Regions:
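Soluble catalytic domains of enzymes that build or remodel membrane lipids, polysaccharides, and related
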Residues: 214-482
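Membrane-embedded alpha-helical bundles of multi-pass enzymes
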Residues: 2-215, 414, 425, 440-445, ...
Length: 506
């Protein structure tokens, strides 16, 4: 039976393991599956340790393909808005999971010579897989979606460690602890199983109570005399592409904002991504803004900004006369969503980006905090996809009061992708120790406190607005100071352990 499953059908088993593992991610968060899937994967690698590197690569690749196929299928929803793109749906289901899965294949292939049935193998596997996860999210593919660390999103206490070590370090820890039951698989013994289970329970409980203590000891201080009004218009995406609808849409946003209710309050009104089709259009709304907003008000919205033959996905700060006070151009662009890799080549086959129109957005140069002119409060601007980058959302100017994220989650309907996007915001809030406020046209507009607690949110894909206060943590987080350097250090220490273990056992 073992030979049939783990030898003759190794590729099918590997794909199946990855597919089921996708359920550890939000919104399902069946975390316990990780303690079954990872040990089984390690046993599968052990059973095939005498196979070629190519065979080991395919085991890891198919594991990754199953995992990403069932956790990223929702990306095809973004192809529903243009008939010319419908043909890409099957291609998307094959290509995107395949590209990301290559990293898991490489991780498996690289550790072939270390496959054993002991603790050493678990450490090597955890370091290899977490390192390849980091590389695919930061250096080679710019797509850090669906790290295993996001399985803990259901436990606010368990997430407090993010403020100290960050998501990539938690990802390393998650892989490692999921793999521990493997130690009891090869030569099963109740005593060994008891030790493994006790170690897992002790570690998880220690982290939980550490997080609980962190929450209790972190004092949040409210910024006085200041409100943020977050909008969720719930406008159909197809309507937003019609230029003659823009003025009507802006009027609707003002009505939802209800600025006259806050005329004596210092307030920031946050509208979603992609409100204006051209930033120059803002001057058309000078009278409309002046008639509705007061001198106490600033407005943030998303717009396309043109500069010569380049165009940018921008976040813009306006005053109550629709004058541009500041703008930020998006740096992290979505592959095929906002930028077409190898554009000159693919243009010849009539391939365009998912967001409407041909051509690619240009990449912004730098990200700095934006200062409001009503009270000198500063926020860090992030547009949509940029909230998912752990350890690289910050700026050299680290002094800011909160993180502001505008988005358009309507591309992915009411799918798991919309919820996962929201969960990333929670992780960034805890890492940076900053409140995250996010406005999205469709999805989950929300306010997340610096400790990750959800302060306010809208219903899924309903038209509404929420008014929130801004809170600041009484101290900076360790991760906000050192960012992914902490992950580098943990990886280095693990590699030293691996080296010393090999030397000792040679």
């Amino acid at each position: 039976m073992k030979n049939f499953l783990f030898k003759k059908n190794k590729y099918l088993v590997s794909f199946s393991l990855g597919s089921v593992l996708s359920l550890i991610l939000p919104p399902y968060s069946y975390t316990a599956l990780g303690f079954l899937i990872f040990p089984t994967l390690l046993y599968l690698l052990f059973a095939n340790r005498d196979q070629t590197r190519k065979s080991i690569f395919y085991i890891g690749f198919l594991f990754g393909y199953g995992y990403f196929l069932f956790s990223l299928y929702w990306i095809t929803y973004s192809l529903n808005f243009d008939d010319n793109l419908a043909i890409l749906k099957p291609l998307t289901l094959v290509v995107l999971p395949s590209v990301v899965a290559i990293f898991y294949g490489l991780a498996s292939m690289l550790i072939k010579n270390t496959i054993t049935n002991n603790f050493y193998f678990i450490v090597v596997f955890s370091v290899a897989l977490s390192t390849l996860d980091f590389l695919r999210g930061n250096l080679f593919f710019d797509f850090p979606w669906n790290l295993f660390a996001y399985t803990w999103s259901w436990s606010l206490e368990s997430l407090q460690i993010l403020g100290f070590v960050g998501t990539y370090s938690l990802n390393l820890f998650t892989i490692f602890i999921f793999c521990l039951p493997y130690l009891a698989l090869k030569h099963f013994h109740y005593k060994k199983l008891f030790i493994v289970i006790s170690s897992i329970v002790f570690t998880l409980c220690a982290n939980f109570f550490f997080g609980q203590n962190t929450i209790n000891n972190n004092n949040l201080k409210k910024i006085p005399n200041f409100k943020v009004v977050l909008l969720q218009p719930n406008q159909k995406i197809i309507d937003l592409t019609l230029a003659n609808n823009e003025e009507q849409y802006v009027n609707r946003l003002i009505n939802i904002s209800k600025p006259k209710m806050h005329k004596d309050t210092q307030a920031l009104f946050v509208w979603p991504e992609g409100i204006l089709s051209n930033l120059d259009n803002s001057k058309n709304y000078k009278k409309l803004f002046y008639d509705n907003f007061s001198n106490n008000h600033n407005i943030v919205l998303g717009s396309v900004r043109y500069e010569g033959n380049k165009f940018y996905n921008s976040l813009v700060l306006l005053n109550n006369q629709a004058e541009i006070l500041s703008s930020y151009d998006k740096i992290n662009l979505v592959p095929f969503g906002e930028v077409i890799p190898f554009y000159n080549l693919l243009e010849k086959i009539n391939l365009k980006k998912i967001t409407f129109g041909y051509g690619s957005f240009s990449k912004g140069e730098k990200r700095n905090p934006v200062t409001l002119n009503i009270n000198n409060i500063k926020f860090l601007p992030l547009i949509c996809y940029e909230i998912i980058f752990s350890g690289s959302i910050d700026t050299e100017q680290k002094e800011y009061d909160f993180i502001l994220n505008i988005s358009e989650d309507g591309w992915f309907n009411r799918s798991i992708g919309t919820i996962q996007h929201f969960v990333h915001s929670k992780y960034r809030a805890i890492e940076q120790g900053k409140q995250v406020v996010r406005s999205t046209n469709q999805g989950l507009t929300s306010s997340i406190l610096p400790n990750g607690r959800l302060a306010k949110t809208t219903d899924f894909a309903n038209q509404s607005s929420i008014v929130v206060d801004i809170y600041k943590l009484n101290k900076k987080t360790l991760f906000s100071e050192f960012e992914n350097t902490i992950f580098y250090l943990l990886t280095f220490v693990s590699c030293v352990f691996i080296f010393l273990f090999r030397k000792t056992n040679e």
